[in-house]
Amino acid sequence: MADAESTRRSRITPERQAELHEAVLDLLREVGYEALTMDAVAARTKSSKATLYRQWGSKPELVARALRCTQPVSLREIDTGSLRGDFEVMVEGSDDDQMAKDTALIRGLAHAVHASPELHKALRDLLVDPEITGLQTMLQRAVDRGEVAPDCPALDFVPHMLIGAFIALPLIEDRPVDRAFLRQFIDAVVFPALGV
């Protein structure tokens, strides 16, 4: 299955793929998920609908992969030797402008996720689950190094804390998350909860 999927996706250069993803994100910002069509993406990118469907299979998958390409670094790959260092690399690898754009997109997709099980599954499979797995890997290394107690009850809730911050800040303070806020949140909430 993975070979068929990679063969299906190998016909477009990485540069063209990035161009298509950016066009999808631009259209999402302009019209929202519900009004986004493969016809509009094809017109914007001067490609055929057949190419889009061959490459991505569905609108939900295309949207999820476009969002995934905005992630600056895979959390699984971060390993500085300390949890503080790992979180600092995670924050430094983030871009304030991109986080502001992503916050607006996520806010716009919140309703669509509840209305579209296919979008919900695509976002979980391609965006949320890989990030949570990477974060859990990072946290497990901290446990293995003795930085966090293996029975720390907060370990299971770190993804919830971080995702919650991205949702709550725009709602409460009407501003997107930025690196300064993330550092402050991690130092004031995440590390104390982990006993670090």
What kind of region is each of these model predictions?
Residues K121, D125, D129, V143-A188:
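Hydrophobic/aromatic-rich alpha-helical bundle segments in the mid-to-C-terminal region
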Residues L75-A104:
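Hydrophobic alpha-helical connector segments
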Residues L20, A35, S58-V63, V73-S74, ...:
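Short amphipathic alpha-helical segment with a characteristic S/N-K-E followed by hydrophobic residues
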Residues M1-R44, A50, E61:
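Basic, helix-initiating cap at the start of DNA-binding domains
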